[in-house]
Each structure stands twice: as C-alpha cells, then as structure tokens.
C-alpha cells in the first residue's frame, strides 16, 4: 500500500494542472503516486498533459485517466479514489501550487493524530496572503447573515458565521476547503465516497459533516502552505464577486445540502432567512451609498431551485 495518493481533477485547465504537477516534483514518486482525472474536457487538455508527461518521463509515475463523462467534482475525485491504494488520499485542485514540504507535513499530521480523519493546509495567494479555508457548517441562519451583510446582524449571530478567522495556530474546523485536503482512507471505508449528486459546491461540506457524524475530526496545520489561485474551472467565485447570476448547479447543490442535513423545513427556513436578509440589504442600500450587498442577480428566485424536489438529480450544465 502506498503512503498517500495525490488526485488532481482537470477540466479545461491543462496549463494549471501542469503547473500543479511541477510543484509536486520534490515528492518521492514511489511514496506519493499521482492520479490525474480529466473530466472529459472539450479542449485539448488530454493531449497537452500527455505531452508534458512524455517529455518529462512521468508516464510511469502519473496515472492519467480520461473520464468518459463530466459528472462534476465529486465524481471525478471518486474515480481517482477508486483506483488509489494508499493509507491517505490527497485531493488537490488543479489551480494550486504546493509549497515545499506541505504534503509531508499533512501526512505526518494525520500519522501523529490517529483520531483525525482529515488534515488541511494554509491556503494562500501567490503573494503569501492567507485565504479563508476553515469553516463552521452552513446552517439555515447563515443565510440571514450573508444576505443582510449588516454589522449588527453579524454581531448578534457571530457564533454561526461560516468562515473561521484566519489563524497561525492549529485549528479544528467543522469543515475545510477541498481545494487541498488530505483524507485518511479509513474515512471512505466508514462513510463512503463523495456524494456525486453534488455536481459542484457543498460536496465538501456534506462529506465533512458525514465524517464528523461518524466520529472523525479535522485538523488544520497552518505550517503547511499551498497556493490557491481560485476559480480555475468554475465561474462561481468570480460571478459572485461581480454580483452576476450564479450557475444553476450551485443552487441545486445548496438545496440538496440543506434538505439532506436539515430536512425540508430546514431548507424552507434557509430560504426565508435569506429573504429576510435581502429586505435588510435593500433598506441599507436605500440609505447608504457605500453599502456593499452580497446579493447576486436573480438570487431571490434562484434560491428556490429544486425546492419541491431537493433530492432530484442535478441538471448537467450542458443541458441548461
């Protein structure tokens, strides 16, 4: 059995994937085999990645899998997990650059803490500024906090805020970003793989919640550093920053998450809380030119996506 397998999902990001692979060059190939799963990219990703592997004699140490479908982030990772044979599995976004020693630190963290099921690094921008990567679980009340984006409401419900403050100390978050996370293989044996009905987004929150319910905890090691460029294959973060309309799959995943873990009434409460916050945001906007709203285009309608059937299979983006 290998010590840890590294799984990278590629979807139309061959240059990023190659750069990510280059950052792993210091790692012992015999102990850390790499698996790249291409989610049926419609471009020449396979050719470009294959060419890089050929030119650098990496075909024996990197397994490139061409999936016959693009079934999302969870499905791609599950494909890699199913062919791995290691004590630990590292899920790694293609838009990441691993700093020297980071993966070894994460592996040692789990080896020294057998009660921990997952370990996450400090995600950072290329200039070294840290990113939020440790969180509390999304609960219905969080929808009020986010949509209102108003100081007094945030202060009242601060203990429910999803992002944890960035810290240089060891943390034990409820969930962590899957841009880079090391998972003990025993966790998959205990709770199963990632839920493939989440096309993209909320699959990490869901997995961490299931893991915690099974008795596994998460540890964040701030001494391990990984650059996260963000948004390599998804427009959600850039669209949200511009307050543009978010893709349907985001709202499908949101509805599925709240329904799965809080029931239909929990999903209803989440949506009502969001609308209450929306009213607060509209009032704030009337009286303050400097107020920055979190409301995206048509979000008041899109949050009700799949409300009547939140467990329904997602609609593939190609079929919108």
Residue ranges and their predicted role:
Residues 7, 213-294:
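Active-site-adjacent helix/loop segment of glycosyltransferases
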Residues 22-31:
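Short, acidic, metal-binding catalytic loop of nucleotide-sugar glycosyltransferases
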Residues 23, 38-49, 69:
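A conserved acidic beta->alpha catalytic loop
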Residues 66-84, 105:
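Glycine-rich, basic loop-to-helix element that forms the pyrophosphate-binding segment
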Residues 89:
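Short aromatic/hydrophobic "clamp" motif used to bind/position activated sugar donors
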Residues 97-134:
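Conserved donor NDP-sugar-binding/catalytic core segment of glycosyltransferases
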Residues 138-174:
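Short, flexible, basic/aromatic active-site loop/helix in glycosyltransferases
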Residues 166-168, 174-225:
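A short, conserved alpha-helix in the catalytic core of glycosyltransferases
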């Amino acid at each position: 059995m290998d010590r840890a397998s590294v799984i990278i999902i590629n979807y139309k990001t061959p240059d990023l994937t190659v750069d990510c692979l280059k950052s792993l060059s210091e790692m012992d190939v015999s102990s850390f085999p790499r698996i790249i799963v291409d989610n049926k990219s419609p471009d020449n990703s396979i050719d470009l990645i294959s060419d890089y592997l050929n030119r650098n004699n990496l075909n024996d140490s990197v397994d490139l899998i061409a999936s016959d479908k693009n079934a999302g982030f969870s499905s791609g990772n599950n494909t890699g997990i199913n062919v791995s044979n290691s004590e630990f599995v590292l899920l790694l976004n293609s838009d990441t650059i691993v700093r020297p020693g980071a993966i070894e630190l994460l592996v040692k963290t789990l080896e020294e803490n057998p009660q921990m099921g997952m370990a996450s690094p400090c995600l950072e921008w290329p200039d070294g500024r840290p990113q939020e990567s440790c969180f509390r679980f999304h609960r219905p009340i969080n929808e009020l906090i986010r949509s209102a984006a108003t100081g007094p409401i945030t202060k009242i419900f601060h203990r429910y805020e999803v992002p944890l403050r960035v810290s240089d100390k060891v943390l034990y978050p409820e969930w962590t970003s899957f841009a880079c996370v090391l998972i003990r293989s025993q966790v998959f044996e205990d709770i199963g793989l990632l839920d493939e009905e989440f096309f993209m987004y909320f699959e990490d929150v869901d997995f961490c919640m299931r893991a915690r319910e099974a008795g596994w905890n998460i540890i964040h090691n701030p001494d391990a550093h990984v650059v996260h460029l963000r948004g390599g294959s998804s427009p959600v973060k850039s669209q949200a920053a511009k307050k543009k309309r978010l893709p349907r799959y985001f709202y499908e995943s949101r509805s599925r998450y709240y329904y799965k873990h809080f029931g239909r009434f929990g999903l209803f409460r989440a949506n009502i809380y969001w609308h209450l916050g929306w009213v607060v945001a509209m009032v704030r906007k009337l009286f303050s030119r400097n107020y920055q709203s979190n409301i995206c285009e048509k979000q008041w309608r899109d949050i009700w996506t799949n409300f009547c059937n939140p467990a329904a299979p997602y609609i593939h983006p190609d079929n919108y």
